[in-house]
Amino acid sequence: QVVGLKNVMRNELSVEVHGLDDLRHLAGPAVLVANHASHLDTAVLLSTLPAKRRRRTAVGIVGDYFFESWLRSGASAIAFNTFPIEQKGAPTRTAADLLGRGWSVVVFPEGTRSRDGFMRPFQMNAAQLAVQSQVPVIPVGIRGTYAAMPRGSYWPLAGRPRVGIRYGPPILPRPGETPQEFAPTIVAAVKQL
């Protein structure tokens, strides 16, 4: 899976990666929180993660689209190690269970892909997961995927479009901090990238 994914990324896109040092030194599970502009986002994120973390990372995706047909659900589970989440933004028991078993979880808290390439408001799921599970959040900024593979496209545009991904330093909720208090910190960290 990963070899194929990396080959597709290398052949179809020009991907620039920043911020992996903090990620390599982080032990244990984390919630990776990224903006979401294209179906490419998951592939770019997974293909750039260090192998040790990637092997124990699952991706939360909207269940009402990807899990409505057995073909899409099987393909996404095999290619990207996915599990369903609610579009309304509530964290799932599956995500909390994965974190409890030492897995990292990718969350796109906008709830859906951007319609115009700009970041949408974040829902509370990532903050709730981090606070409830007491794990760090790794903010992730992804740029260029909307232009490389806009809505309605099934493959990246020709010409190896440029895409950038930046991993920010891990952030932890403060002791006693609520998800509502922690959420703006996450949003600001992702926007900054």
Features from the language model and the residues they span:
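Generic preference for hydrophobic
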Residues: 17, 32, 59-60, 165-167
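Helix-to-loop junction immediately C-terminal to a conserved catalytic motif
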Residues: 4-36
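Residue-level signal for beta-strand positions within conserved beta-sheet cores that form or flank
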Residues: 13, 55-56, 161-163
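Non-catalytic C-terminal accessory region of glycerolipid acyltransferases
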Residues: 89-193
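Short gly/ser/thr-rich secondary-structure transition/capping motifs
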Residues: 11-18, 86-89, 148-149
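Catalytic core of membrane glycerolipid acyltransferases/transacylases, capturing the structured
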Residues: 25-87
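A generic structural signal for well-ordered alpha-helical segments
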Residues: 8-10, 76, 98, 130
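Short, basic, glycine/proline-bearing loop/turn elements
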Residues: 5-6, 77-83, 109-112
